[in-house]
Curated annotation (Swiss-Prot):
Belongs to the YqgF nuclease family. GO terms for cellular component: cytosol. The keyword Nuclease applies. Gene3D superfamilies: YqgF/RNase H-like domain. Its main location: cytoplasm. It is found in: Cytoplasm. This is Putative pre-16S rRNA nuclease.
């Protein structure tokens, strides 16, 4: 018999597809489980990057941050793995918001063939990362409800 699920407070989340030249940003919520690409930040330095992020956080007021966790296809870390982890840790340290990590191995590859996505590829990748987060969140909640 399934246990009734407790009411869960909706989550507004902001996701990031981190890159050394550009950072894609998306926002969404756990009610619709959909993400919306916001922008791709091409900041010349980390101060400018975090200033842009601070403005987005003030506007959207998320209570959860999500960062793509890049790895090789076999799951092994590579040079961007440590950089993305550092970026996520900096987000947490600067803005005191929880950071969740989502496997982003194939997000850009899924979108690269779509001509409509090319102009804002990184923000659309962040959207896929965010939707994967909501999917995993759903799976975890359903597993707990069945226990």
């Amino acid at each position: 018999m399934l246990k009734p699920m407790a009411l869960i407070t909706p989550i507004t989340a902001m996701a990031f597809d981190y890159g050394t030249r550009r950072v894609g940003v998306a926002v969404g919520n756990s009610v619709t489980k959909a993400g919306e690409p916001l922008k791709t930040i091409a900041a010349p330095n980390s101060d400018t990057l975090f200033k842009d992020i601070e403005q987005l956080l003030a506007e959207w007021q998320p209570n959860q941050l999500v960062v793509g966790h890049p790895t090789h296809p076999d799951g092994a870390p590579h040079e961007m793995t440590a950089k993305a982890i550092r970026f996520g840790n900096q987000l947490h340290g600067r803005f005191q918001l929880p950071v969740a990590w989502v496997d982003e191995r194939y997000t850009s590859a899924v979108l690269e063939g779509d001509a409509q996505m090319r102009d804002n590829l990184d923000a659309h990748s962040a959207t896929l990362i965010l939707e994967q987060y909501f999917s995993e969140l759903d799976t975890n909640l359903n597993t707990k409800a069945a226990d």
